[in-house]
């Protein structure tokens, strides 16, 4: 890799035949997690093999813990396969080797001793009934070697030597993506560095919208039509491109990284469930950025239980329109949106997902002074800690009119099904945004550690500081590969809801840990609002 640090001292910290070692370790971890899966299946399913909802609710700690074990296993597998590909291409340099070794050492140790699901929740082997298997996993020679030798002080110091050079690159490691994706990353990295990063903190502190000038520039760069097929005015690129663009824009500011999400959701809904006329009419306008969509799903008393939504859409006697009445909340960027993907109940006889329909509801753009100029629509801003730049709102509908021809697909009762079909992409994109935030936290913490001097030297030279940064970089290696794997599965037409969920789960924890540790590196300055790390921590919580 260009710019990577090499040398005898660094190479001596790498376990011999590392790629073969981690491949064998990954297989051992997979077998270990498979036993855990079997134990959980016994506890969480009925005699006929179907999930036991009461047991799942009662044993949420166990079920969530199994999710974490599965996520670790998949992350290590995808990291091992990435390492093997790089080695075959002659690109598995010292930097990649050290970070991979550290990741395997730490995750294997956690799988045996306890995986942190968050700061106050840990899943341990005895809670899954796999104590003997944990002992056996530690006794596996390659796993034991990685745990004992893979993350020593000397190894961490060697990895730390590789980090300062990373500030001149977009990622610490060689990601393994092709030349086209490297060019896409370079383009959006430069845009984020030049046009977003210098202003992001001011936008955040003032709770300002991302300027329309920036939105229009993003449209010109193709952000809103990235994955829309060329026949509908888009670029026809895959979810890998979506990941790269989301990463880089989120590295600049999470708001800009998320701007394209609503377009992605709307476009995928229309591609999956829309009529030919709806595709022809809406997709080119979404792709060009002429129309900005917003997703209007969540309600105040339902939260994630979308099947119990109460907002009603009643068809007029003449069949020309629907009248929508109800309340929605946590709606992102609705004021400046032109189109709402609005989930509402069209069958009043139902109280579950079967009576829900998706409406493509047009609305005029508003302003801060007049946020919702449309008849039958009101709203109030929800002031938020972070994730600013688009603004969150509660919205009330009272006889709000939507043309009948804007019923997605022209058939009622398909809304929940259509929405669920978009969740794979949404989770992948959420993971990519979290990676961008984590990358920003890493770079911000690293730069501060190199600039700040205490006791006559850079604070980066203290292991308690540099070790935090090394672990950030190592976890970024793993979660990138997990996220890219999910994207490749989606691009290949394969079901990937499990892998996409894993990527989102891990990336969110990594983003928060990276931001928290980067703020700690800043010491007292991290608590000062003038320092961007204070914003990054708030944005990471989302």
What are these regions (language model features)?
Residues 311-315:
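A structural signal for short hydrophobic beta-strand segments in well-ordered beta-sheet cores
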């Amino acid at each position: 890799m260009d710019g990577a640090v090499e040398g005898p001292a660094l190479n001596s910290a790498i376990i011999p035949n590392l790629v073969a070692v981690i491949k064998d370790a990954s297989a051992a971890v997979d077998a270990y997690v498979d036993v855990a899966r079997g134990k959980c299946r016994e506890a969480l399913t009925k005699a006929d093999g179907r999930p036991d909802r009461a047991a799942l609710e009662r044993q949420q700690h166990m079920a969530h813990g199994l999710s974490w074990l599965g996520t670790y296993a998949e992350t290590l597998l995808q990291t091992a396969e990435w390492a093997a590909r790089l080695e075959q291409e002659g690109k598995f340099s010292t930097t990649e080797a050290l970070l991979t070794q550290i990741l395997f050492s730490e995750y294997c140790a956690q799988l045996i001793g306890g995986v942190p699901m968050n700061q106050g929740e840990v899943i341990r082997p005895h809670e899954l009934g796999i104590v003997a298997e944990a002992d056996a996993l530690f006794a596996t020679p390659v796993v034991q070697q990685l745990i004992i030798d893979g993350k020593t002080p000397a190894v961490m110091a060697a990895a730390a030597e590789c980090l300062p050079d990373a500030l001149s690159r977009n990622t610490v490691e060689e990601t393994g993506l092709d030349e086209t994706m490297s060019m896409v990353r370079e383009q959006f990295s430069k845009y984020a560095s030049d046009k977003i990063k210098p202003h992001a903190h001011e936008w955040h502190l003032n709770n300002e919208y991302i300027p329309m000038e920036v939105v229009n520039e993003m449209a010109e760069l193709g952000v809103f039509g990235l994955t829309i097929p060329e026949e509908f005015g888009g670029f026809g690129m895959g979810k890998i491109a979506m990941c790269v663009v989301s990463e880089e824009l989120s590295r600049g500011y999470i708001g800009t990284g998320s701007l394209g999400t609503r377009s992605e959701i709307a476009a995928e809904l229309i591609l999956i469930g829309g009529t030919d006329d709806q595709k022809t009419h809406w997709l080119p306008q979404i792709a060009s950025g002429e129309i900005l969509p917003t997703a209007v799903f969540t309600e105040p008393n339902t939260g994630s239980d979308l099947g119990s939504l109460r907002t009603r859409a009643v068809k007029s006697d003449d069949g020309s329109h629907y009248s929508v009445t109800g309340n929605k909340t946590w709606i992102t960027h609705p004021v400046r949106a032109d189109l709402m993907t609005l989930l509402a109940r069209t069958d009043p006889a139902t109280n579950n997902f079967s009576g829900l329909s998706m409406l493509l509801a047009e609305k005029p753009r508003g302003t801060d002074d007049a946020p919702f100029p449309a008849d039958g629509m009101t709203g109030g801003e929800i002031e938020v800690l972070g994730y600013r730049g688009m603004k969150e709102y509660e919205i009330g509908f009272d006889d709000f009119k939507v043309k009948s021809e804007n019923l997605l697909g022209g058939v009622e009762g398909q809304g929940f099904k259509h929405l669920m079909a978009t969740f794979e992409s949404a989770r992948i994109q959420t993971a990519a945004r979290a990676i961008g935030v984590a990358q920003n936290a890493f770079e911000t913490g690293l730069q501060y550690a190199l600039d700040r001097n205490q006791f006559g030297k850079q604070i980066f030279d203290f292991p308690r500081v540099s070790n935090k940064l090394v672990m950030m970089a190592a976890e970024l290696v793993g979660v990138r590969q997990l996220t890219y794997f999910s994207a490749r599965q989606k691009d290949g037409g394969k079901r990937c809801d499990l892998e996409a969920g894993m990527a989102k789960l891990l990336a969110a924890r990594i983003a928060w840990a990276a931001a928290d540790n980067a703020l700690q590196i800043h010491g007292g300055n991290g608590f000062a609002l003038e320092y961007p790390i204070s914003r990054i921590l708030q944005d990471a919580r989302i």
